Amino acid sequence: MSSGGLLLLLGLLTLWAELTPVSSLDRPKKPGLCPPRPQKPPCVRECKNDWRCPGERKCCRYGCIYECRDPIFVK
């Protein structure tokens, strides 16, 4: 491969790496608050962050319990 082709490939890889989000940490949290703690067995992990929950649901943490819940809004 010529040095020009290699340089172009390196430039494209660098651009791709810059434009690809590393993780969901780059995303903002969804609006609203988590409702009161549910009655569930200990340490259920249904999600890791809001973006792993469908629609408007939030990933809510209650001790070692993580689950997708509909948000509540407080005025």
UniProtKB/Swiss-Prot annotation:
GO terms for biological process: antibacterial humoral response; innate immune response; venom-mediated disruption of cell wall in another organism. The keyword Glycoprotein does not apply. Residues 27-72 form the WAP domain. GO terms for cellular component: extracellular region; extracellular space. It holds the Pfam family WAP. Expressed by the venom gland. Disulfide bonds join 34-60, 43-64, 47-59, 53-68. It is found in: Secreted. Damages membranes of susceptible bacteria. Has no hemolytic activity. Not toxic to mice. Does not inhibit the proteinases elastase and cathepsin G. GO terms for molecular function: serine-type endopeptidase inhibitor activity. It comes from Demansia vestigiata. Gene3D superfamilies: Elafin-like. Belongs to the venom waprin family. SMART domains: WAP. Its main location: secreted. The keyword Flavoprotein does not apply. This is Veswaprin-c. SUPFAM superfamilies: Elafin-like. Keywords: Antibiotic, Antimicrobial, Disulfide bond, Secreted, Signal. Residues 1-24 form the signal peptide.
